[in-house]
Amino acid sequence: MSITKDQIIEAVASMSVMEVVELIEAMEEKFGVSAAVAVAAGPAAEAVEEKTEFDVVLTAAGANKVAVIKAVRAATGLGLKEAKDLVEAAPANLKEAISKDEAETLKKQLEEAGASVEIK
């Protein structure tokens, strides 16, 4: 006489937790398997999106503030007073959402003038 799946399920449902643990251990031994939860292969990891827009942040004017103000004016097109206020308000965003090449060029120009600059 053959036992059906429903009968097995009913038998397991009527067992205590300790009996179920013992049953699992016996099945692991008998069939040479592990009852550890198998991790299902999820969707492939999404490609990390490369950042395309960068912000250039003036963190400090440095010792040569006049040269930094000139560099800020040249880079941003601001007037003398606005550029001076921006440099004195450091840390301050100089340009936002620009390309990586443009950000690197601006950073290099400002650092040559004596400023401390970050690209975010």
UniProtKB/Swiss-Prot annotation:
<comment type="similarity">
    <text>Belongs to the bacterial ribosomal protein bL12 family.</text>
</comment>
<dbReference type="GO" id="GO:0006412">
    <property type="term" value="P:translation"/>
</dbReference>
<keyword id="KW-0689">Ribosomal protein</keyword>
<comment type="function">
    <text>Forms part of the ribosomal stalk which helps the ribosome interact with GTP-bound translation factors. Is thus essential for accurate translation.</text>
</comment>
<dbReference type="Pfam" id="PF16320">
    <property type="entry name" value="Ribosomal_L12_N"/>
</dbReference>
<dbReference type="Pfam" id="PF00542">
    <property type="entry name" value="Ribosomal_L12"/>
</dbReference>
<dbReference type="GO" id="GO:0003735">
    <property type="term" value="F:structural constituent of ribosome"/>
</dbReference>
<dbReference type="GO" id="GO:0003729">
    <property type="term" value="F:mRNA binding"/>
</dbReference>
<dbReference type="GO" id="GO:0022625">
    <property type="term" value="C:cytosolic large ribosomal subunit"/>
</dbReference>
<dbReference type="InterPro" id="IPR014719">
    <property type="entry name" value="Ribosomal_bL12_C/ClpS-like"/>
</dbReference>
<protein>
    <recommendedName>
        <fullName>Large ribosomal subunit protein bL12</fullName>
    </recommendedName>
</protein>
<dbReference type="InterPro" id="IPR000206">
    <property type="entry name" value="Ribosomal_bL12"/>
</dbReference>
<dbReference type="InterPro" id="IPR008932">
    <property type="entry name" value="Ribosomal_bL12_oligo"/>
</dbReference>
<comment type="subunit">
    <text>Homodimer. Part of the ribosomal stalk of the 50S ribosomal subunit. Forms a multimeric L10(L12)X complex, where L10 forms an elongated spine to which 2 to 4 L12 dimers bind in a sequential fashion. Binds GTP-bound translation factors.</text>
</comment>
<dbReference type="InterPro" id="IPR036235">
    <property type="entry name" value="Ribosomal_bL12_oligo_N_sf"/>
</dbReference>
<dbReference type="InterPro" id="IPR013823">
    <property type="entry name" value="Ribosomal_bL12_C"/>
</dbReference>
<keyword id="KW-0687">Ribonucleoprotein</keyword>
